[in-house]
């Protein structure tokens, strides 16, 4: 009896031990190729940033992609075929990863694979359970078995980062919990830690992007700086010491230096990408810097071909709600926590969007200056046609949001919970809202003409 009891206690202790195994392997060969954007067609290019927001964001962004797939330009081509880049966070990362794995024609399968499944009921959510107190003390109510493993088995079927289609480029964003800097599953980050990006499971990347603090335990990444055969790229030191570089770029560069400091760091603990930037646009600024060129991450040939670059931020932000603004006493405890969580995500996201607007303007200026510095011979070798106008390129930034819709639709979509699962009728409404927002957007309409 005593032996049986001890055995049960031992098993319980083992069962309660958190799984903190790193998701990555050391770099086996040469560093990852540069994170370049490959454009197609005649130089009219679309990029998308898909925000976080759980199943609300995943569903709304799915509607956006479906409508782009079903919208044709003046030549009969699909607008979605112009999409060269998708950067995404949390709920938006599920949709982006699915799109990168299955392409435009496989988008409809996301509902059965993920959105229509009741994942929420499988999670540990109650604060009343002593077992959950222990889980919380270990770093989060839910571990990899409730996030990475579920995504791998139910959604992505064992796919790895190498299995994503080359185009569009999919950028999945998390947050380095130690530095607070963005961490993207892209070549510059994995070169900095001397790790094999291609071997990372797609589910682990998405899980890192979705790992909301407290609700989910951080995803662990190992740094391999001690064994690294190459130095940090020159742009890292330049960005870290620059007085004019965007703050998030400087912090990202500083985090890269931490990755190589074995006295300071052996493991990176990744949490929800929305903690640093719920739009995922900050990583694009890093990719720009890491390219080492005025036009990067566009290739030189694509930068010459480029005519119009339209960047859509898809914002599935929840509406502010509650009756406490009518009360002199203000919010109660739970309402205060909910409001603080919303502010903590929305404030840095809005700051990142404003900073990115300035970066888009600079990107356009840099591309024009570089193009106009080319000799006619060099421009021709890169594919420039006769009578090519080096300054004829237009960069545009727009935000797709619930506020673009009717008041009724805005209210319905904005009250959807931030949860990993939602009722099917709510998903229907969110997908329809994403479609409607694209169908009536002026920048999208301009792309059809």
Model regions and ranges:
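Sec-dependent bacterial lipoprotein signal peptides
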Residues: 1-14
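Catalytic domains of lipid- and phosphate-ester/thioester hydrolases
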Residues: 13-449
């Amino acid at each position: 009896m005593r032996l049986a009891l001890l055995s049960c206690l031992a098993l319980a202790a083992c069962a309660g031990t958190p799984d903190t195994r790193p998701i990555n392997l050391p770099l086996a060969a040469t560093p990852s190729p540069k994170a370049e954007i490959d454009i197609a067609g005649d130089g009219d290019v679309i990029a998308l940033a898909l925000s976080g927001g759980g199943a609300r964001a995943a569903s709304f962004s799915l509607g956006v992609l479906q409508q782009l797939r079903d919208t044709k330009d003046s030549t009969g081509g699909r607008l979605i075929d112009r999409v060269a880049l998708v950067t995404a966070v949390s709920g938006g990362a599920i949709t982006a990863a699915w799109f990168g794995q299955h392409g435009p024609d496989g988008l409809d399968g996301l509902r059965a694979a993920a959105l229509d499944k009741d994942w929420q009921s499988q999670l540990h959510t109650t604060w009343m359970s002593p077992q959950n107190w222990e889980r919380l003390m270990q770093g989060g109510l839910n571990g990899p078995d409730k996030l990475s493993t579920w995504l791998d088995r139910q959604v992505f079927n064992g796919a790895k980062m190498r299995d994503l289609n080359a185009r569009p480029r999919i950028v999945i964003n998390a947050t380095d919990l130690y530095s607070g800097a963005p961490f993207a599953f892209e070549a510059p980050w994995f070169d900095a830690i001397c790790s094999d990006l291609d071997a990372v499971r797609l589910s682990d990347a998405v899980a890192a992007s979705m790992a909301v603090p407290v609700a989910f335990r951080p995803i662990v990444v190992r740094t391999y700086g001690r064994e690294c055969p190459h130095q940090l790229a020159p742009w890292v030191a330049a960005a870290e010491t620059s007085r004019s570089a965007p703050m998030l770029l400087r912090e990202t560069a500083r985090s890269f230096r931490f990755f190589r400091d074995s006295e300071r760091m052996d493991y990176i603990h990744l949490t929800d990408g929305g903690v640093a930037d719920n739009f995922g646009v900050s990583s694009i600024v890093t990719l720009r810097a890491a390219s080492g060129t005025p036009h990067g991450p566009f290739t030189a040939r694509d930068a010459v071909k480029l005519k119009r670059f339209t960047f859509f931020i898809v914002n599935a932000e929840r509406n502010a709600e509650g009756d406490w603004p009518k009360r002199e006493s203000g919010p109660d405890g739970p309402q205060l926590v909910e409001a603080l969580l919303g502010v903590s995500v929305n404030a840095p996201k809005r700051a990142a969007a404003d900073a990115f607007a300035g970066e888009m303007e600079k990107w356009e200026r840099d591309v024009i200056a570089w193009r106009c510095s080319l000799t006619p011979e060099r421009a021709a070798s890169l594919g420039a046609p006769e009578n090519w106008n080096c300054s004829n390129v237009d960069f545009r930034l727009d935000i797709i949001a619930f506020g673009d819709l009717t008041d009724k639709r805005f209210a319905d979509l904005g009250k959807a919970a931030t949860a990993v699962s939602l009722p099917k009728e709510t998903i229907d409404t969110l997908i329809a809202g994403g479609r409607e927002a694209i169908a009536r957007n002026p920048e999208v309409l301009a792309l059809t003409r």
